[in-house]
Amino acid sequence: MNHVNVEEVEEQPDTVISKFLVKSFTAFVLFDIGASHSYISRGFVDKYKLPTQALRSPMLVTSPGAEYMASLWCDRLPLRIGNYVFPSDLIVLESQGLDVILGMDWLSN
């Protein structure tokens, strides 16, 4: 994962960030081709009481300057982009700033 907050993203000319609806809630969403998986922040999950499930085994996620241990995920959360809805599997991270990071797993589908 290359970015974890909005300030980092805004400094990079080759990144795409926008606001989209995740299960009817507005979220800052980053499209990150450097991320192998897709993520959602713990704060966003808690704020909107989104359903989570335990990962089969915890996952170590690394980003520049930080490591996170992830143990939860959100199964098939609806992400609305324009008139299209994409069911999205998102790993829950204890990160701040960005609500959702869409990685190559999401972008390749």
What spans do the regions from the language model cover?
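Acidic, Ser/Thr- and Pro-rich low-complexity intrinsically disordered regions characteristic
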Residues: 1-109
